[in-house]
Amino acid sequence: MRPTMVAGNWKMNGLSGDAVHLTQAILHAGLEPMRPEVVIFPPFTLLHAVSQEAKSSALRWGGQNLFWEASGAYTGEISGAMLRDMGCRYVLIGHSERRQIFAESDAQIVQKIKAALLSGLIPVVCVGETEAERAQGLTDAVLRRQLEAVLPLLNLEASQPNLIIAYEPVWAIGTGLSASPEQAQAVHVFIRELAAAYSAQLARRLLLLYGGSVKGNNAAALFDQADIDGALVGGASLQAGEFIQICRAAESAGRGG
Ligand SMILES: O=C(CO)COP(=O)(O)O
């Protein structure tokens, strides 16, 4: 399998001018449409600006989070319908920063995934172990717990998976210390095996992104791995040149070059 998605998670960064600049840089980079699919996840406040720039292109965008209720007295929250209204195709759910800083539980993440699916969004569900968990040999156990909540939501009636999984080891996020291609590949194989318990066909087609200090200079080696289908990029997605380099690495991997 070959990388099919490069996604940029801008986190809580950027003002309108930055959104226009970054989006235009990606649009003008001459990337091959959909090889890979390029997706950006700006803050909610920049979704409109991004959608205006990218609406007639192959570039896609999504929200970084959502709340599970459709509407109502939930001050400060954003629903799936609101994201759809901004033209979003995707939504990040369960990012480790949400799990750690905002104490999101596996049960809440399940509610969010259900709400996203009901709204017609494709959830990009983030999983991953902390440094302490890896040191204690708990990586598989943590991923199993996180994914046992998520994988039952796979639509077994469909021919294509209704969600995407991003493996983001917490120790690799924002540290400059990416997982090695072999480490990431081993975990991706494990995740695919867990998914195969629900459906072998969907497991084969499940998009597994790697995230954690992906840069222009390490992306190609990650994409060379058979089960790394793309990347979820944080810091480097805020620098147009770096992000475009990662997209090009995915293009080349897609050509077998
Ligand atoms: O959290 C991430 C993407 O969601 C990864 O962040 P970095 O690429 O900055 O390590």
UniProtKB/Swiss-Prot annotation:
Its main location: cytoplasm. Substrate binds at N9, W10, K11, G174, S213, G234, G235. Keywords: Cytoplasm, Gluconeogenesis, Glycolysis, Isomerase. The active site is at H95 (electrophile), E168 (proton acceptor). Pathway: Carbohydrate biosynthesis; gluconeogenesis; Carbohydrate degradation; glycolysis; D-glyceraldehyde 3-phosphate from glycerone phosphate: step 1/1. One of its GO terms (biological process) is glycolytic process. It is found in: Cytoplasm. InterPro entries: Aldolase_TIM, TIM_sf, TrioseP_Isoase_bac/euk, Triosephosphate_isomerase, Triosephosphate_isomerase_AS. GO terms for cellular component: cytosol. It catalyses: D-glyceraldehyde 3-phosphate = dihydroxyacetone phosphate. Its EC number is 5.3.1.1. GO terms for molecular function: triose-phosphate isomerase activity. Involved in the gluconeogenesis. Catalyzes stereospecifically the conversion of dihydroxyacetone phosphate (DHAP) to D-glyceraldehyde-3-phosphate (G3P). Homodimer. Belongs to the triosephosphate isomerase family. This is Triosephosphate isomerase. The gene is tpiA.
